[in-house]
């Protein structure tokens, strides 16, 4: 029981630390809409594999390009992985009110929508979306152990 309390306290401390890192979000067409960390029976990628995923939503009524943006993820303070969304792929242009799904599988060689990091639900997970000017666009922190397998952490409705 004490280990669980300590784990919860550490998770809360990490979330507070990440939330107070002083970066101000810029207004953007694109937002982090949904995150699924433990994918055992959910969407499959083009290779038939199930991995954690991050959904980015274009909340505007015009197309928005993710090329040059960055997805960042951290499971512990001071240790942030960064995935640079490549330029030159027409699929990074997200149509109005549509989604782009990124696989957090640590396999960027599989294509534009496969990140160089994996997510672990046993610790608090912070995910940030940065624009091509390296300004924070949106962020979310998923508390440790908050989700069961195949349960996503999402906005109440798209872009809400």
What are these regions (language model features)?
Residues 1-9:
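Bacterial N-terminal signal peptides that target proteins for export
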Residues 21-160:
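Activation on beta-sandwich/Ig-like modules and their edge loops
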């Amino acid at each position: 029981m004490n280990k669980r309390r300590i784990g919860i306290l550490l998770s809360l401390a990490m979330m507070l630390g990440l939330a107070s890192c002083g970066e101000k979000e810029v207004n953007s067409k694109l937002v982090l809409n949904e995150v699924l960390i433990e994918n055992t029976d959910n969407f499959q990628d083009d290779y038939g594999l199930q991995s954690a995923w991050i959904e980015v939503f274009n909340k505007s009524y015009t197309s928005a390009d993710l090329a040059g943006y960055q997805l960042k993820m951290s499971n512990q303070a001071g240790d942030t992985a960064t995935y640079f969304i490549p330029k030159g792929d027409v699929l990074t242009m997200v149509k109005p009110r549509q989604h782009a799904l990124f696989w957090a599988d640590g396999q960027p060689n599989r294509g534009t929508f496969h990140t160089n990091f994996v997510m672990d639900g046993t610790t608090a997970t912070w995910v940030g979306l940065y624009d091509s000017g390296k300004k924070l666009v949106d962020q979310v922190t998923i508390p440790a152990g908050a989700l069961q397998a195949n349960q996503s952490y999402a906005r109440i409705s798209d872009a809400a």
